[in-house]
Regions:
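Extracellular/periplasmic carbohydrate-active domains that bind, remodel
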Residues: 1-130
Length: 130
């Protein structure tokens, strides 16, 4: 991928459980931290904001972009990508974003797809497909 961003993290990494063989034993302090649930759960949500990429050349990438927030309330925000030339297998998708900008993007897409857009707010996607 030229860019891959996702808020759909793996919950197994966020909600750890102490293995049975360690119960009742002294464990490192950072394990205690990892085993402590985040309450309320909203405090544990990741936020991706204010991301800038420019002057990128990519050849034979699998996909140009996969960028997605979690839902209507938890979006990726303020992404600015410019001056990108790429040859890719497929275009990809942008979903649940706010203020996502693509400018001066030149794509050669093997499967002839275009970047799909889903539930984005105030986004400006300017792509020259070759």
């Amino acid at each position: 991928y030229v860019l891959a961003v996702g808020l759909n993290w793996n919950p197994k990494y966020s909600y750890s459980a102490l293995p049975e063989e360690y119960k009742g034993k002294k464990i490192p302090s950072h394990w205690v931290t990892m085993l402590t649930p985040v309450e309320p759960k909203e405090k544990g949500y990741p936020y991706f904001r204010n991301v800038y990429f420019s002057n990128i050349q990519a050849d034979r990438a699998k996909r140009f972009i996969t960028a997605s927030g979690w839902n209507e309330e938890l979006r990726i925000e303020n992404f600015y990508l410019s001056n990108i030339n790429a040859s890719v297998e497929s275009a990809g998708k942008i979903a649940y974003s706010k203020n996502f900008r693509l400018k001066d993007i030149h794509l050669t897409v093997e499967d002839k797809t275009k970047v799909q857009e889903e539930d984005n707010i105030d986004s400006r996607i300017e792509i020259d497909y070759k």
